[in-house]
Design a protein with these regions (language model features):
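Alpha-helical transmembrane segments
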Residues: 1-14, 125, 171-174
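Membrane-interface coil-to-helix junctions
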Residues: 9-104, 126-149
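Membrane-water interface at transmembrane helix exits
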Residues: 17, 80, 108-112, 159, ...
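Central hydrophobic cores of alpha-helical transmembrane segments in multi-pass inner-membrane proteins
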Residues: 101-109, 151-156
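Transmembrane-helix signature of polytopic, membrane-embedded enzymes
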Residues: 107-130
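Hydrophobic alpha-helical membrane segments of integral membrane proteins
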Residues: 119-124, 142-147, 169-173
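Membrane-interface transmembrane helices that cradle and orient dolichyl/undecaprenyl
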Residues: 154-170
Length: 175
């Protein structure tokens, strides 16, 4: 069933936006949401400073933490630092799809762990995928949904913590 959910995610991403062009909007996504993480990454390559304070190339120079909204230390974007040969726009397409698919699959497994049947868990995860913000925001305003896999892991971790199965499983909550 998880493989089927990934296929549905791929199909619906293609159906709703991929067949009309790129999995990413031509407004905010290409002008802001791929540009700022690429700037953060380039600044890291240029300075080697993981915690810079000043961004000289943005707005005449500003405190870089003014742009934390664009995912300055997001785990999703930090992985791109390891891939200097990949264009940020291509990376964001892959990362957005991966976040969406993993959130759907993690929700499915969390529901099964909570005692729901496979059918109910599958249909709920499919409805979650088809909810208005998930696919739309994945290719328009990625920062509104790229936290969803971490939220699903946090739900799983809180359940384990409350059942005292594993005290260390609460750590995804802090991301």
């Amino acid at each position: 069933m998880p493989f089927l959910l990934i296929l549905f995610t791929l199909f619906f991403c293609w159906l709703f936006c991929g067949r009309y062009g790129v999995f990413g909007s031509k407004v905010d996504w290409i002008s802001q949401h791929s540009v700022f993480p690429d700037y953060f990454r380039q600044q890291f390559y240029d300075t080697g400073d993981f915690f810079p304070e000043f961004a000289a190339g943005i707005g005449g120079g500003q405190n870089i933490y003014n742009f934390a909204y664009y995912g300055l230390y997001s785990p999703v974007f930090l992985l791109s630092y390891l891939l200097p040969f990949v264009k940020m726009s291509d990376y964001l397409i892959a990362a957005s799809f991966t976040c969406l698919a993993s959130a759907v699959v993690l929700l499915y497994f969390w529901l099964i762990k909570r005692g729901f049947s496979q059918t109910v868990s599958f249909l709920t995860a499919l409805l979650f995928l088809l909810s208005a913000p998930m696919i739309f925001q994945s290719y328009n305003q990625i920062m509104f949904v790229n936290y969803m896999p971490f939220l699903c892991m946090a739900l799983w971790g809180v359940d384990s913590f409350l059942k005292k199965e594993n005290r260390f499983s609460i750590y995804p909550v802090y991301f």
